[in-house]
Regions:
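Bacterial N-terminal signal peptides
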Residues: 8-17
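Beta-propeller folds
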Residues: 20-174
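Glycine-centered signal
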Residues: 1, 19-20
């Protein structure tokens, strides 16, 4: 009798486990499209010069743009250091979409990367902008270049120039 109950319980648990474990079969289209695993991270973080805060990009739902926000590591206090209103293209009046930013060594300018295009596996082509935090001036680099053709832009060590690659040539702008 006990054996019959044990067999019945085992059979029910195996059958119900098989039903709950039924999943959609993997196919190549889902894998290539990136529909299999989706992760959500906190995005890129950059330590600021003071060594006590880091900056992150955050969407501003009111403006549709991107704020650059600083968080203090000790207490996680939050401060918007560059509002999306400063990251607006003056010619169109619309906020520029921000993919990533890098700071100059003195934290007085930021290099903004946007409008990215994939080359092989990585988004290495795009457009670059420089925001001068002293006067709030936002300037697009490579104005005469084709859209999304610039790569690997970096500040000079003194933060006065930016170098980038486009069409296998190296350019430097003040």
């Amino acid at each position: 009798m006990k054996l019959n109950k044990l067999i019945a319980i085992a059979t029910i648990s195996l059958l119900s486990g098989g039903i709950s474990m039924a999943q959609k079969a993997l196919n190549l289209e889902d894998i290539v499209a990136g529909n299999i695993i989706q992760t959500k991270g906190i995005g890129s973080m950059t330590w600021l010069k003071d060594g006590e805060r880091y900056s992150r990009l955050e969407n501003n739902k009111q403006t549709g743009g991107t704020d650059i926000v600083a968080y203090r590591a000790k207490d996680n206090s939050r401060e918007v250091i560059i509002p999306s209103s400063l990251l607006t293209d003056k010619s169109t009046g619309r906020p520029i979409p921000v993919r990533s930013v890098s700071w100059s060594a003195d934290n007085e300018k930021i290099l903004i990367y946007n409008n990215t295009r994939r080359v092989w596996r990585y988004d290495t082509r795009g457009d670059y902008w420089v925001l001068n935090l002293k006067d709030g001036a936002l300037r697009q680099l490579g104005k005469g270049m084709p859209e999304s053709s610039m790569m690997f832009a970096k500040f000079s060590p003194d933060g006065t120039r930016v170098a980038y690659v486009s069409n296998n040539n190296i350019y430097v702008e003040d």
